[in-house]
């Protein structure tokens, strides 16, 4: 029998999407409740960003992360917690003076970007091994920054999830594994597909990136927007795990907004089981990932 498939649920993200679907959770209570609901629907992992409760905009406030994590743990939910470290990597140059950062730039130190991880000690945290045009904004993660973040994360006892958005990012992540920056005999990669202007969300691209990974790696993949569910099926076929959630896609079907993260997880579970595979529970997921 093939290995059970782990479903991860990305609950809210950092995009300006809270007004596009009322189901997008904003407050720590809403985010924690969505985590618990997604877990009950079949997600063994929840991937967490936080938002300013007043504005709905993305936030890096460690107090908000702590409240979300505490609420999930206090509820006794067995879900594996995965916190983001993505915010703090946006550099926008002034058009007339490119060496000068524009007002929309948000660049933080490694310590600032992982402070909530060190404090809350989740099971996993994402590490964006990527410098790219992320839509209309440059995302900058220099190798020295990534190395320092990886060290701080692992010193806190947390497993890095290496998020890669194109083939060059896979090469850098592999280099970090090969040189011992990532000290993990089961390194975890997330193949992020369909984001402008990274790798497209196709089965061919997923396969190409998968074939670049170390033999001992665990991997998952996701596609954004209308590619979310096709990429679930592709990941199952290609031997990986999958991710869904309102961070990546606001719709359950064409023109129909998802009622919540649990609905997206339930659909992913249906796809996995219809393909003859088993959905991993939290215990199985921990064993697979070496947590």
What are these regions (language model features)?
Residues 1-23, 87-96, 126-133:
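N-terminal small/glycine-rich loop or linker at the start of catalytic domains
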Residues 124-247, 258:
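Catalytic alpha/beta core domains of metabolic enzymes, predominantly
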Residues 61-139:
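Active-site beta->alpha loop and helix N-cap motifs at the rims of alpha/beta catalytic domains
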Residues 9, 56-85, 148-155, 208-216, ...:
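Alpha-helix-loop-beta-strand connector modules within alpha/beta enzyme cores
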Residues 9, 28-33, 43-55, 80-85:
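Histidine-centered catalytic micro-motifs
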Residues 31, 38, 49, 125, ...:
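Conserved, mostly hydrophobic/aromatic
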Residues 266, 270-291:
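Mid-to-C-terminal alpha-helical segments outside catalytic/metal-binding sites
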Residues 19, 44-68, 134, 192-193, ...:
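Glycine-rich, proline-tolerant flexible connector loops at the mouths of alpha/beta enzymes
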């Amino acid at each position: 029998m093939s290995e059970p498939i782990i479903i991860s649920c990305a609950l809210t993200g950092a995009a300006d999407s809270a007004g596009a679907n009322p189901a997008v959770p904003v407050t720590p209570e809403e985010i924690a409740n969505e985590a618990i609901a997604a877990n009950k629907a079949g997600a063994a992992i929840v991937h967490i960003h936080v938002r300013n409760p007043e504005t709905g905009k993305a936030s890096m406030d460690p107090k908000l992360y702590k409240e979300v994590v505490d609420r999930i743990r206090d509820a006794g939910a067995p879900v594996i917690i995965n916190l983001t470290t993505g915010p703090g990597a946006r550099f926008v140059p002034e058009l007339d003076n490119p060496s000068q950062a524009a007002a929309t730039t948000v660049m933080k130190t490694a310590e600032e970007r992982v402070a909530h991880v060190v404090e809350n000690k989740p099971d996993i945290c994402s590490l964006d091994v990527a410098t790219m045009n992320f839509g209309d904004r440059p995302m900058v993660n220099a190798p020295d920054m990534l190395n320092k973040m990886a060290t701080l994360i692992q010193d806190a006892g947390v497993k890095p999830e290496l998020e890669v958005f194109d083939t060059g990012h896979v090469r850098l992540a592999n280099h970090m594994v090969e040189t011992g920056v990532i000290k993990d005999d089961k390194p975890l990669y997330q193949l992020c597909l369909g984001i402008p202007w990274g790798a497209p969300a196709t089965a061919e691209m997923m396969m190409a990136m998968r074939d670049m990974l170390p033999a001992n790696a665990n991997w998952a993949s996701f596609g954004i927007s209308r590619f979310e569910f096709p990429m679930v099926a592709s990941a199952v076929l290609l031997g990986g795990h999958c991710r869904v959630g309102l961070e990546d896609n606001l719709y359950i079907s064409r023109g129909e907004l998802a009622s919540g993260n649990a609905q997206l997880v339930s659909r992913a579970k249906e796809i996995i089981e219809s393909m003859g595979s088993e959905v991993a529970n939290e215990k199985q997921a921990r064993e697979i990932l070496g947590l």
